[in-house]
């Protein structure tokens, strides 16, 4: 990976006149930086084929019962500072988002060209999420880290890299929905990047139908939103807007922003109540999700793991690959290692093994066939501070060619209400 200080840094400020709407919700100040960085430079040359000693080191960190020794500022001395603080010859000269009529417009999401190294500074925890202000991911970031400085990113990969490059301190990203299933992209990114899972948070999805002030439902000829949101409100939309066309948009809150920015009086969006507040839209219908049990699970990611404990329920996430030529038959042995120790599994997900996608089986007399090879993601209810979890993983290691602990973290045990728009 190229050294951060060798990036071709370019700077830009956000033009407040680029939007034709003034929003009422004050958003924390943002900074925008452009860098000649390319995403492929973060690909690990050996893919997922890390050594066993690598995994053992990670496991030792997670199972340690001794608090980590804190860095005494040495790292901060080596990384360029921001907001007027300099390091050596590097001065980022960042400019905060300007205001219009005394009100701050919602910040533009970080893109892949906005990534530039920055250290921890100030008292607010900076949390990256995918989407624009008003997205459900922003609500998850606020629940996970109250009073944080939320940083919108236009892609999941950018959110990962924002943490790695010290632009953000944490990332909060979705991994599964109770109706839509797993978000495979983020499972792949968990393996590609070296961030650690330090927590989880579950958010009820509370959809609203939004439009410009004064627009009635019978005037709506088009409804836009994320494909999952449109699918989750299909029956309600059939009743509310039976003749309206439905068009996919990349993000729920971005759909609301698009209507507001372009003054579209014939278009409605499926998004959160917070998006209506941010983009000066009215709520035509509240709580239009077809299934009240619509919940999205988010993971909290950090550069360093947390010390696992036993005084509260913990969950541990791992990823592994079967030994070569063994195929998925070893999955039974792996699962037995947990069952024998009375460890409950909460999630099993398979993803293609990108380094070894196919396995040739058979002999010359009857020909050969090709089977797919997979990586397996498993969540189980135990802390890495517990001997049973350590012993289970020691046995699992015997059956696998690759094993990595993604994190051992507290389970989200907080109650939530499906009827509150504040949750969305």
Curated annotation (Swiss-Prot):
GO cellular component: chloroplast; chloroplast stroma
InterPro entries, per database record: ACT-like_dom_sf (IPR045865), ACT_dom (IPR002912), Preph_deHydtase (IPR001086), Preph_deHydtase_CS (IPR018528)
Residue runs in coiled coils: none
Pathway: Amino-acid biosynthesis; L-phenylalanine biosynthesis; L-phenylalanine from L-arogenate: step 1/1
Catalytic function, reaction form: L-arogenate + H(+) = L-phenylalanine + CO2 + H2O
Tissues expressed in: Expressed in roots, leaves, stems, flowers and siliques. More abundant in stems and roots.
Residue range covered by the transit peptide: 1-34
Pfam families the UniProt entry points to: PDT (PF00800)
Enzyme class: lyase
Keywords: Amino-acid biosynthesis, Aromatic amino acid biosynthesis, Chloroplast, Lyase, Phenylalanine biosynthesis, Plastid, Transit peptide
Keyword Chloroplast: yes
Classification via Gene3D superfamilies: 3.30.70.260, Periplasmic binding protein-like II (3.40.190.10)
Biological process, per Gene Ontology: defense response; L-phenylalanine biosynthetic process
Lineage: superkingdom: Eukaryota
Domain ACT: 319-410
TM annotation in the entry: none
Molecular function (Gene Ontology), one example: arogenate dehydratase activity
Cellular compartments annotated: Plastid, Chloroplast stroma
EC number: 4.2.1.91
Boundaries of every Prephenate dehydratase domain copy: 126-303
Role this protein plays: Converts the prephenate produced from the shikimate-chorismate pathway into phenylalanine.
Comment field (misc): Has no detectable prehenate dehydratase activity.
Record's protein name: Arogenate dehydratase 4, chloroplastic
């Amino acid at each position: 990976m190229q050294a951060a200080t060798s990036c071709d840094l370019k700077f830009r400020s956000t033009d407040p006149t680029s939007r034709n709407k003034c929003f009422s919700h004050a958003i924390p100040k943002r900074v925008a930086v452009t860098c000649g960085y390319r995403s492929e430079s973060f690909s690990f040359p050996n893919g997922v084929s890390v050594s066993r000693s690598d995994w053992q080191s990670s496991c030792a960190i997670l199972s340690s019962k001794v608090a980590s020794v804190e860095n005494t500022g040495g790292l901060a001395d080596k990384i360029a500072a921001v907001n007027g603080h300099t390091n050596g010859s590097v001065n980022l000269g960042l400019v905060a988002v300007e205001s219009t009529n005394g009100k701050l417009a919602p910040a533009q999401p970080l893109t892949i060209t906005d990534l530039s190294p920055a250290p921890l500074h100030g008292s607010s925890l900076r949390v990256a999420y995918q989407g624009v202000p008003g997205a459900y991911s922003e609500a998850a970031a606020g629940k996970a880290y109250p009073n944080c400085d939320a940083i919108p990113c236009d892609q999941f990969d950018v959110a990962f890299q924002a943490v790695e490059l010290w632009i953000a301190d944490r990332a909060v990203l979705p991994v599964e929905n109770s109706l839509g299933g797993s978000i495979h992209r983020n499972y792949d990114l968990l393996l590609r990047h070296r961030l650690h899972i330090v927590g989880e948070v579950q958010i009820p999805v509370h959809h609203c139908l939004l439009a410009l002030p004064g627009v009635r439902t019978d005037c709506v000829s088009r409804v836009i939103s994320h494909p999952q949101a449109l699918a989750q409100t299909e029956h309600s939309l059939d009743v509310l807007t039976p003749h309206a066309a439905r068009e996919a948009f990349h993000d729920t809150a971005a759909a609301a922003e698009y209507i507001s920015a372009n003054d579209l009086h014939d278009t409605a969006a499926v998004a959160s109540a917070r998006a209506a507040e941010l983009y000066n839209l009215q709520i035509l219908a509240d709580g239009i999700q077809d299934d009240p049990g619509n919940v999205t699970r988010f993971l909290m990611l950090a550069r360093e793991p947390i010390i696992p404990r036993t005084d509260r329920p913990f969950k541990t996430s791992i990823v592994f690959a079967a030994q070569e030529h063994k195929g998925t038959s070893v999955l039974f042995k792996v699962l037995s290692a947990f069952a024998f120790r009375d460890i409950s599994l909460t999630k099993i997900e398979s993803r293609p093994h990108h380094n070894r996608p196919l396995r040739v089986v058979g002999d010359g007399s009857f020909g050969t066939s090709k089977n797919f090879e997979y990586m397996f993601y498993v969540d189980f209810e135990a802390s890495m501070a517990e001997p049973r979890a350590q012993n289970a993983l020691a046995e699992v290691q015997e059956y696998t060619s690759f094993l990595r602990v993604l994190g051992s973290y507290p389970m989200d045990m907080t109650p939530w209400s499906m009827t509150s728009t504040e949750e969305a």
